[in-house]
């Protein structure tokens, strides 16, 4: 390789680096070298927060040119479709043919056109799922959506559950197991990852499979997919249980205090978080003179009265309270 060739290559590489730097944008202040840069959206400027130098001006705004002040206005002014979502088997990128049988002006279409649209609609539904894998995914995601709606969990949980199920399908973990079982386990795993307090009992109530199968499948997919799950904090169940029992914030605060104090003593290890929270609420209701029976608390927490009695005795002994 000649000297002039090497020189040209070095110049080309340097030019490419400059272009990459310009594409990435300014990373530090050319005046003081600080990386504490603040973007001023109203002036379209990039300003150094340390020395005040305007590093960039007249920046391009990638947002829409229109303004909206609420969700309805944003929907009306937006000229794009819905974002992609993991909760649909085709990620929401399909075309849906409306069933209204009306034209763009709201007028009814002819019978010939109606027949044509009916055929198109039927074929559209058929080609949406090209193989058994997609049909499996479509059914599973609809099950996740149904159960999530019944449980009243946020949309983020549905997205996470859908991603977990897609991973399980890709790793061929569905073989030998029911679609409903894996879908329910994915939803339970998503609730735990997102910190949404839902017990296996609550999940099994809205599912079409038994609790034992859900637990068994959940342990299998979490191990195979390497899902890192933190232990469920019993305090996350306290607000919902107290609300259903119509207990005051004083009881809620006392229950949290009991959980914190007794957990530090090591009582929580190996215990069911729902039963532990239920016992703390029962103890707090007695201490705050808002007594609820063990049966009432057990019904709300979906645990047995025996569990509440056992956890209650352990907790009051650890707190040094004589019941």
From Swiss-Prot:
Write down any Gene Ontology CC term.
Answer: transcription preinitiation complex
Q: Which residues bind Zn(2+)?
A: 29, 32, 48, 51
The record's annotation in PROSITE patterns points to: TFIIB, ZF_TFIIB
What SUPFAM superfamilies has UniProt attached to this entry? Cyclin-like (SSF47954), Zinc beta-ribbon (SSF57783)
The molecular function GO annotations come to: DNA-binding transcription factor activity; TBP-class protein binding; zinc ion binding
Lineage, top-rank taxon, reads Archaea
The alphabetical list of record keywords is: Metal-binding, Repeat, Transcription, Transcription regulation, Zinc, Zinc-finger
Zinc finger residue extent: TFIIB-type? 24-56
**Is Transcription among the key words of this record?**
yes
GO BP term, pick one = transcription preinitiation complex assembly
Where are the sequence-type repeats located?
142-225, 236-317
Physiological role = Stabilizes TBP binding to an archaeal box-A promoter. Also responsible for recruiting RNA polymerase II to the pre-initiation complex (DNA-TBP-TFIIB).
HAMAP family in the cross-refs: TF2B_arch (MF_00383)
Q: Which PANTHER family match?
A: TRANSCRIPTION INITIATION FACTOR IIB, TRANSCRIPTION INITIATION FACTOR IIB-RELATED
Q: What family is this protein classified in?
A: Belongs to the TFIIB family.
Q: What is this protein called?
A: Transcription initiation factor IIB 7
Organism of provenance:
Halobacterium salinarum (strain ATCC 700922 / JCM 11081 / NRC-1)
């Amino acid at each position: 390789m000649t000297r002039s060739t090497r020189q040209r290559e070095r110049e080309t590489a340097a030019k490419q680096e400059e272009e990459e730097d310009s594409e990435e944008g300014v990373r530090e202040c050319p005046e003081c070298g600080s990386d504490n840069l603040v973007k001023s959206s109203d002036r379209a400027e990039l300003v150094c927060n340390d020395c005040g130098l305007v590093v960039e001006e007249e920046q391009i705004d990638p947002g829409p040119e229109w303004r909206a002040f609420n969700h309805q206005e944003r929907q009306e002014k937006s000229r794009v479709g819905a974002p992609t979502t993991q909760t649909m088997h085709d990620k929401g990128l399909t075309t849906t043919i409306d069933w209204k049988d009306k034209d763009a002006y709201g007028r009814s279409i002819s019978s010939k056109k109606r027949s044509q649209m009916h055929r198109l609609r039927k074929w559209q539904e058929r080609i949406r799922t090209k193989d058994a894998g997609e049909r499996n995914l479509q059914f599973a995601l609809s099950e996740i959506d149904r159960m999530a709606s019944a449980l009243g969990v946020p949309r983020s949980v549905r997205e996470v559950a859908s991603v977990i199920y897609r991973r399980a399908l890709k790793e061929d973990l569905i073989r030998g197991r029911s679609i409903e079982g894996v879908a329910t386990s994915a939803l339970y795993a998503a609730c735990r990852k997102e910190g949404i307090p839902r017990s296996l009992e609550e999940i099994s109530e809205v599912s079409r499979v038994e609790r034992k199968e859900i637990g068994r499948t959940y342990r299998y997919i979490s191990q195979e997919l390497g899902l890192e799950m933190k232990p469920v904090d019993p305090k996350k169940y306290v607000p919902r249980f107290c609300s259903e029992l119509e207990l005051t914030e004083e009881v809620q605060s006392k229950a949290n205090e009991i959980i914190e104090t007794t957990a530090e003593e090591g009582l929580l290890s190996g215990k069911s978080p729902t039963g532990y929270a239920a016992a703390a609420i029962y103890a707090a209701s007695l201490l705050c003179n808002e007594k609820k029976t063990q049966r009432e608390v057990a019904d709300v927490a979906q645990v047995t009265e025996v569990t509440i009695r056992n956890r209650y005795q352990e907790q009051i002994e650890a707190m040094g309270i004589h019941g």
